[in-house]
Amino acid sequence: MEDAESTTKDPVDRVEKVTWRDLQDGSFTAELKKLICFAAPMAAVVITQSMLQIITMVIVGHLGRLSLASASFAISFCNVTGFSFIMGLSCALDTLSGQAYGAKLYRKLGVQAYTAMFCLTLVCLPLSLLWFNMGKLLVILGQDPSIAHEAGRFAAWLIPGLFAYAVLQPLTRYFKNQSLITPLLITSCVVFCLHVPLCWLLVYKSGLDHIGGALALSLSYWLYAIFLGSFMYFSSACSETRAPLTMEIFEGVREFIKYALPSAAMLCLEWWSYELIILLSGLLPNPQLETSVLSVCLQTLSMTYSIPLAIAAAASTRISNELGAGNSRAAHIVVYAAMSLAVVDALMVGTSLLAGKNLLGQVFSSDKNTIDYVAKMAPLVSISLILDSLQGVLSGVASGCGWQHIGAYINFGAFYLWGIPIAASLAFWVHLKGVGLWIGIIAGAVLQTLLLALVTGCINWENQAREARKRMAVAHESELTESELPF
């Protein structure tokens, strides 16, 4: 009698483990379809977003090797110190807003988005000062003075784009966490189509040269934020989740920071390890060639990583929604479906990259040495792509569960205690140069993927669903108890 009563009161579905038989009852296929319908347009969104930086590098790169190297350095530095940090902080919404939407606390999404914008804008103030003095800092760090000076000028013109990014990232997650991908898709495609001619005009016709690329990137980020903000304000699709600007946005600052800091640590520790490789390449003999080649490899990896990142975004959203709704079994099935998609994507894209390795360098540069070096690096980039596809989805699972702090510990150990030391040893002591740097990154990614897989296998999904419900009850100011949440 007591057990029956507790079962009625407990809104979380009880499931021991998802077995192979469970995956054959139609739930797996249905979840696979949901993920594909979410991830396919989301992949286009991620690709067009990442292509803004890549197109900028391509257009600037044809001005010459110095322009490509300085723009690469500037974008790498700005990614490390600004864009990655802002994106990482905003990832807190993957847990908070995703679970709030699953719990049908729709208005919380708008409030949380405004809270994130406020916090991220404040963060941009000290970061902009750092960017303004980037050229001097790079010289102090021992970088080539000519590259450092031009990179500093490029970064200064990217400062307006940083503030736009602080608005753009919460808006992106506001739409993503309620599975409204169409506004993101339309906006990203429009901005991309505008960015290409805008960047070309500012670089080649305005007399700004490579500085025009930075200005074009900043303007495109602002256009992106304005378009999404307008859709949020005017569209009827956002009527339930839209919230007015009130003092309530300041009440959620502490909760946002609680999840934002570990989210930022998780993302940044991985992102920074790749960017650190670019900075280390500037200390190698022939720094212009090494920096240009590794920057091309990193941008290629970023572009091809768009599909697994979209799958990870879909998995994170679906898991957080299901946990917020108390559906632990459905959340568990999402993991199997997402990993299946990631494996297929890794094999297809990795094979395609190897097949086109001789053409890859020509997209970014007309310098023969750069083109040949990029072709030599392509097999290593393919291995990185396969590993990133797997760990990307596993990281998405951690975000959906609110386990970003565990992901941060894993990324720190895998890259900074293992991968980066191996990279430095191979590059400077074994004299493998850029190849050695990338092998070290692969070693870190292998350990990262194994540890994330181990953690995912140990998740108790029933407990995760119960914790999500408790979190939503607290967010609802305890006006509703855990069992009274409006599912």
Swiss-Prot record:
The chain crosses the membrane at residues 35-55, 73-93, 122-142, 151-171, 184-204, 211-231, 264-284, 293-313, 330-350, 377-397, 412-432, 435-455. The keyword Magnesium does not apply. GO terms for molecular function: antiporter activity; xenobiotic transmembrane transporter activity. It comes from the Eukaryota. Keywords: Membrane, Transmembrane, Transmembrane helix, Transport. It is a multi-pass membrane protein. It is found in: Membrane. One of its GO terms (biological process) is xenobiotic detoxification by transmembrane export across the plasma membrane. Signal peptide: none annotated. The keyword Transport applies. NCBIfam families: matE (TIGR00797). Belongs to the multi antimicrobial extrusion (MATE) (TC 2.A.66.1) family. This is Protein DETOXIFICATION 11. The gene is DTX11.
